[in-house]
Amino acid sequence: MKILYVEDNDDNIYMLKNRLTRAGYTVVVATDGAQGVALAASEQPDLILMDLSLPVLDGWEAARRIKATPTTSRIPIIALSAHAMTGDQEKALAAGCDDFDTKPVELQRLLDKIRTLAPPESAA
């Protein structure tokens, strides 16, 4: 299963990409929201992990654009945020994200969300 991880923090990328790879996932990385939108279209991942605080295009707008594009609209998106502020989850879901999780990521909880939104049998 292929996951697109949209994140601009190198430490977060290194940590989560390695953990997901060890769990058996192929991980493609975008470092800003615009690149995330482009890679969602070209890579057609099974699921997207989207940081919300991104350069160029924030995660909320990137999620809106991905969900508004017919070729990417069905890709599940899990929003990730270190700022678990009141309203962030609601704002992410309103932007089209399918789920929300906080950073630092608790791996087992995130893996459970990934399996729920993109079960292995749905992988291309």
Protein language model annotation of sequence segments:
Residues 7, 31:
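Conserved acidic carboxylate
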Residues 14-22:
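Charged docking surfaces used in two-component/phosphorelay signaling
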Residues 51, 81:
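Active-site residues of response regulator receiver
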Residues 105-114:
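C-terminal output helix
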Residues 55, 73, 85:
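The feature encodes the CheY-like receiver
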